[in-house]
From Swiss-Prot:
Subcellular location as annotated: Virion; Host nucleus; Host early endosome; Host Golgi apparatus
Key word DNA-binding present: yes
Domain of life of the source: Viruses
Alphabetically ordered keywords of this record: Capsid protein, Cytoplasmic inwards viral transport, Disulfide bond, DNA-binding, Host endosome, Host Golgi apparatus, Host nucleus, Host-virus interaction, Late protein, Microtubular inwards viral transport, Phosphoprotein, Viral penetration into host nucleus, Virion, Virus entry into host cell
Residue numbers spanned by region Disordered: 211-230
Gene source species: Cottontail rabbit papillomavirus (strain Kansas)
Purpose: Minor protein of the capsid that localizes along the inner surface of the virion, within the central cavities beneath the L1 pentamers. Plays a role in capsid stabilization through interaction with the major capsid protein L1. Once the virion enters the host cell, L2 escorts the genomic DNA into the nucleus by promoting escape from the endosomal compartments and traffic through the host Golgi network.
Record-given protein name: Minor capsid protein L2
Family: Belongs to the papillomaviridae L2 protein family.
Intervals of motif Nuclear localization signal: 2-10, 473-478
Gene Ontology molecular function: DNA binding; structural molecule activity
SS bond partners: C19-C25
Length: 492
C-alpha cells in the first residue's frame, strides 16, 4: 500500500474569508479569528471578577492609572501638584479728576461786547528823500485819516556767503587754477554771483620716490634670507626623513632643483612668460591606477604629490635639497589607494674652505724715533728697511744721533747720544744723570776681539731698549731704583 502524501493547506488568513461565506470553516481557524479559543475564554470569564483596565496594562497608554506612579521606597502620601503662579498686576494710583477751568462765566451775559482797538502806526527811524524834490499829489478823499506807505531810499544790507563743500572736490588736471565763487544777496531779493580767479598757491610736482644713497660697503645683516620670512619651521626638519618609514631615493637630474614637474610627467606644452609656476610649493599630480603611464624618470613612477623643497645638511657636510613624495601603487576593492612614502634628495657640491692668502711681510727692525743732536724740538720718523737692504750702502746718517727717553708721567725728557762708526766700541762714561751716556769725544783703542760690556737701559712703562742685542748673554743683573722712579739695570 502506497502512503498518501499530505498536502499543505493554505494560510489561515487566506482560508477564513472564503470558508466564512460557504459556512464550512474548520473549527481551529474559526475559533482563532473569532476569539473563541480556550485561552480567550479564560480571559473573558476571569475578567468578570477582576478589573485591570486602570493600570495601563496591555495596549493602554501606560499613564500609571488614575493616581499615577509612586516611588517604591517612598511612603504612601498624596502628590500635590504645584499650580502656576499668576503674575502680579501693577496698580496705579488713582486720584481725583482734573478740574477743567471755566472758559465762560455761567452767570454772565449771553452777548459779548466788542471793543475797538487803535490803529497801529508804523515807526520810521529816518527818512532819506531822493529824486528831483517834487512831491507827488495825494488823492482827494473825504473825511477821515489817510495812511500812506513810505519806502525809504536807503540801500539794503549786503550779506556775503562763502560755502565750501568738504565732501565734493572738483577734479583738477594739469595747471588749472581753482576759483572761488562768492554769492552776494541784497534785501531786494536780487543775487549777484562774483567769480574770482585764484592764481596763488604752490604747485608741487610729483616726483618718483627715491631711496637715500648708500655706500658700496653699507649692507645690513638680517636674520632671514628672504623678503617675507616664514617663522614656521620646515616640515622636513620636524620629520625624521632618515627613518625606515621613508624610502631614500637619490636624484641625479639637476632639474629636480627648479623643474621637478618635468621628472614626474611629460608635458607637451610651451613656456608661457606671463605665467610663472611656483615650484617652491607642494605639487599635485593626477594618476590613474587602471592605466600605466610612463614617467620621464623611473624613480618618480606613481608619484601623486611632492612637498615643497627643504635645504638640509647631510652627515658628510654637503648641502642637500629634499622633497617628500607620496605614491599610489595599490588599490583595494573599496577604492582606498595607498603606496610607500619616498624621500627624494639631491646633494649639491660641498663648499670647501678657500686657501688662506699668503701675505709676505718683510722682516724689519722695530721702528725707533730719532732726533738730531742739533735740533731738539723737531722729531723725524726713521724709515724702515729690510735686513739686507743696507749691507752694501755706505752712509753716515747715523753719525751724532741721540736716543730720546721721555717720562710721560712727569713731562721730562732725556737725550742719550749714540756714537758714530768711528767711536763704536769705545768706553762708556757714567755721569751724574739718571741715564748712562756715551761721550763720542773720548776714544780709546782696543783689541778687535775684546767685547765691550752690555748696558740695558730701562725707563718707565714706555718700553725697554737693548744695546747690542745679539751680543747679550745670560748674566747676573744689578737693578738700581732711582729717586725719580726710573730703573737702571747693570749686567755683569
Amino acid at each position: 500500500m502506497v502512503a498518501r502524501s499530505r498536502k499543505r493547506r493554505a494560510a489561515p488568513q487566506d482560508i477564513y474569508p472564503t470558508c466564512k461565506i460557504a459556512g464550512n470553516c474548520p473549527a481551529d481557524i474559526q475559533n482563532k479569528f473569532e476569539n473563541k479559543t480556550i485561552a480567550d475564554k479564560i480571559l473573558q470569564y476571569g475578567s468578570l471578577g477582576v478589573f485591570f483596565g486602570g493600570l495601563g496594562i496591555s495596549s493602554a497608554g501606560g499613564s500609571g492609572g488614575r493616581l499615577g506612579y509612586t516611588p517604591l521606597s517612598g511612603g504612601g502620601g498624596r502628590v500635590i501638584a504645584a499650580a502656576p503662579v499668576r503674575p502680579p498686576i501693577t496698580t496705579e494710583s488713582v486720584g481725583p479728576l482734573d478740574i477743567v477751568p471755566e472758559v465762560a462765566d455761567p452767570g454772565g451775559p449771553t452777548l459779548v461786547s466788542l471793543h475797538e482797538l487803535p490803529a497801529e502806526t508804523p515807526y520810521v527811524s529816518s527818512t532819506n528823500v531822493t529824486g528831483d524834490g517834487a512831491a507827488e499829489p495825494l488823492p482827494a478823499g473825504h473825511g477821515g485819516s489817510q495812511i500812506s506807505d513810505v519806502t525809504s531810499g536807503t540801500s539794503g544790507t549786503v550779506s556775503r556767503t562763502h560755502i565750501n563743500n568738504p565732501v565734493f572736490e572738483a577734479p583738477m588736471t594739469g595747471d588749472q587754477d581753482v576759483s572761488d565763487v562768492h554769492v552776494f544777496a541784497h534785501s531786494e531779493s536780487s543775487i549777484t554771483i562774483n567769480q574770482t580767479e585764484n592764481t596763488g598757491g604752490e604747485l608741487i610736482e610729483m616726483v618718483p620716490l627715491r631711496h637715500p644713497p648708500r655706500s658700496e660697503g653699507d649692507f645690513r645683516e638680517t636674520s632671514f634670507s628672504t623678503s617675507t620670512p616664514i617663522p614656521d619651521r620646515s616640515a622636513l626638519r620636524s620629520i625624521n626623513v632618515a627613518s625606515r618609514r621613508y624610502q631614500q631615493v637619490q636624484v641625479e637630474n639637476p632639474a629636480f632643483l627648479n623643474r621637478p614637474r618635468e621628472l614626474v610627467q611629460f608635458e607637451n606644452t610651451f613656456d608661457n612668460p606671463a605665467f610663472v609656476d611656483d615650484e617652491q610649493l607642494s605639487l599635485l599630480f593626477e594618476q590613474d591606477l587602471d592605466t600605466v603611464v610612463a614617467t620621464p624618470d623611473p624613480a618618480f613612477q606613481d608619484v601623486v604629490r611632492l612637498s615643497r623643497p627643504s635645504f638640509t645638511q647631510s652627515r658628510a657636510g654637503r648641502v642637500r635639497v629634499s622633497r617628500l613624495g607620496r605614491t599610489l601603487t595599490m588599490q583595494t576593492r573599496s577604492g582606498k589607494a595607498f603606496g610607500p612614502a619616498k624621500h627624494f634628495y639631491y646633494e649639491l657640491s660641498s663648499i670647501a674652505e678657500g686657501p688662506e692668502p699668503d701675505i709676505l711681510i718683510p722682516e724689519s727692525e722695530q721702528e725707533t724715533s730719532f732726533t738730531d743732536a742739533t735740533s731738539k724740538d723737531t722729531q723725524q720718523e726713521a724709515e724702515v728697511y729690510a735686513d739686507g737692504s743696507t749691507l752694501e750702502t755706505d752712509t753716515s746718517a747715523d753719525e751724532n744721533l741721540t736716543l730720546v727717553f721721555s717720562d710721560r708721567g712727569r713731562g721730562q725728557g732725556s737725550h742719550v747720544p749714540i756714537p758714530g762708526k768711528s767711536t763704536i766700541g769705545g768706553p762708556v762714561n757714567i755721569g751724574d744723570s739718571k741715564y748712562y751716556t756715551l761721550n763720542p769725544g773720548e776714544t780709546t783703542s782696543f783689541e778687535a776681539d775684546v767685547i765691550s760690556p752690555v748696558f740695558i737701559f730701562e725707563g718707565n712703562a714706555d718700553g725697554t731698549y737693548y744695546l747690542e742685542e745679539p751680543l747679550r748673554k745670560k748674566r747676573r743683573k744689578s737693578i738700581f731704583l732711582l729717586a725719580d722712579g726710573s730703573v737702571a739695570v747693570y749686567a755683569e
